[in-house]
Amino acid sequence: MRNLDFIDSFIPTEGKYIRVMDFYNSEYPFCIHAPSAPNGDIMTEICSRENNQYFIFFPTDDGRVIIANRHNGSVFTGEATSVVSDIYTGSPLQFFREVKRTMATYYLAIQNPESATDVRALEPHSHELPSRLYYTNNIENNSNILISNKEQIYLTLPSLPENEQYPKTPVLSGIDDIGPNQSEKSIIGSTLIPCIMVSDFISLGERMKTTPYYYVKHTQYWQSMWSALFPPGSKETKTEKSGITDTSQISMTDGINVSIGADFGLRFGNKTFGIKGGFTYDTKTQITNTSQLLIETTYTREYTNTENFPVRYTGYVLASEFTLHRSDGTQVNTIPWVALNDNYTTIARYPHFASEPLLGNTKIITDDQN
């Protein structure tokens, strides 16, 4: 769970809900003032609903947190002068930093995206109830901004599957053995992802209570492309595919706000941009270096058997499969998101001592942009 290790806050809040108090030793918590709406004011007051008082702090790569309410999943969002509760979009004004003041207290700070030097803290407008949260630049020696966490509800984080060795290349057992359609699958990596960043038919409010963290599993295997018995000295043209279908690319983007770049690296949207470092580290993937998305491409390639005896050849390409799971392990995307990477291909052969076929002309015949 590498992405959780990136927190530089002194308060380990990623594994529990906390009841956030407005300032040290206050009896009045933060709560969502209009819990039935997707957005609303964040107030310091006596709350009528318990869930409105509890928040989970989702950590990001750089140590900041996204503060989500247990009742409906809405998050702290900065506006011109105050902080409200709104739907998570990945806006810079939805990322806060916990800054330690004493062993028991801290304050929440937000960076003004228009100014690198403008750091503001959250402060109740007044000590009269109810009171909205406003920004203040008065940070030094200001006790009104101090917060303490109380009445914690511990979460059970999903158990991530153990990583496995990379998939082994299939081995042919005879001249008539075409090999398996797929090799055995290997789990390469997996990572936690907050429920506010994924798409599921379960309501966001229900997700916050039952599966606040999902996980994404990255699996690899060898996918068969073709198989043929090559007579001695024969040449054959074979059709091969690479990339990802447009349907899978769109579904993956909708499901986890992540897509696959043309270089097979991952491209992160606004919602997941803050966890891209931990995500790629955990799943053993890379961040894309291109703005172009991966497409599905069909090739024809010529192969020649240079041996003076018949050889069975079966061509394989490495497949990377991504699946989204709830905390109980239930898979959300019933059809996995699969990318075929033709930078990694192999040809199984029988007899085993035969040489690989000689590669001739390669021609792109279709891609999903045409």
Curated annotation (Swiss-Prot):
Q: List the disulfide bonds.
A: C31-C47
MF GO annotations: toxin activity
Report what the protein is called: Binary larvicide subunit BinA
**Gene Ontology terms describing biological process:** sporulation resulting in formation of a cellular spore
Q: How is it modified after translation?
A: Processed by proteases extracted from C.pipiens larval gut; 6 amino acids are removed from the N-terminus while it is estimated about 20 residues are removed from the C-terminus to yield the 40 kDa toxin form that is seen in insects. The 40 kDa form is 50-fold more lethal against tissue culture cells than the precursor form. Larval gut extracts of Aedes aegypti and Anopheles gambiae also generate the same 40 kDa form all of which are toxic in C.pipiens.
One short Pfam name that applies is Toxin_10
Query: Where is the segment annotated Pore-forming domain?
Result: 156-370
Tell where it localizes: Spore, Perispore
Q: Which residues form the propeptide?
A: 1-6
Q: Which residues form a coiled coil?
A: none
Membership in a protein family: Belongs to the toxin_10 family.
Is Hydrolase one of the keywords?
A: no
- Beta-trefoil domain: region residues: 1-155
Kindly give the InterPro entries that the UniProt entry links to this protein: Ricin_B-like_lectins, Toxin_P42
Keyword list (alphabetical) reads:
Disulfide bond, Sporulation, Toxin, Virulence
- Subunit-structure text: Forms a heterodimer with BinB. Upon toxin crystal solubilization with NaOH at pH 12, only the 63-kDa (binB) and 43-kDa (binA) proteins were detected.
